[in-house]
Amino acid sequence: MSMSDPLGDMLTRIRNALGRKKDKVVTPASKLRAHVLDVLQSEGYIRGYNQVDLGDGKAELEIELKYFEGMAAIRDISRVSKPGRRVYVSAKSLPQVANGLGISVLSTPKGVMADHEAREQNVGGELLCRVF
């Protein structure tokens, strides 16, 4: 069975693992997922991730979740643009997440980046998810 929203699946796996206080979570690999994880790692929301080759051209991403004094670094992570309803924003209309305490992850012509980077580079794009 094919998955209709692979990025939404990864975000749900992360949310569920954080709720169960897991140290790691595994998800199928893709370039978009890896780019989103790069943004989450650079912003300090996860410790890191490794790509594990399973053979037959398949791979998995092993994500190391981050906790601080028993609390998860990610309080909320949600998908914004979905396969049935894409959400695009311009550089000027980028919304703030939690009054600037969280980030939005965007897919832009210059690559996947956080909202503050998109404002600096004056580019808009598809609003993939929000993290707080």
Swiss-Prot record:
Keyword Calcium: no
Transmembrane segments: none
Keywords, ordered alphabetically: Ribonucleoprotein, Ribosomal protein, RNA-binding, rRNA-binding
Keyword Oxidoreductase found: no
GO CC aspect terms: ribonucleoprotein complex; ribosome
GO molecular function, one term: rRNA binding
GO terms classed as biological process: translation
Quaternary structure (record): Part of the 30S ribosomal subunit. Contacts proteins S5 and S12.
Family as reported in the entry's similarity comment: Belongs to the universal ribosomal protein uS8 family.
PANTHER family: 40S RIBOSOMAL PROTEIN S15A (PTHR11758)
Function, as annotated: One of the primary rRNA binding proteins, it binds directly to 16S rRNA central domain where it helps coordinate assembly of the platform of the 30S subunit.
Protein's name according to its UniProt entry: Small ribosomal subunit protein uS8
UniProt source species: Bartonella tribocorum (strain CIP 105476 / IBS 506)
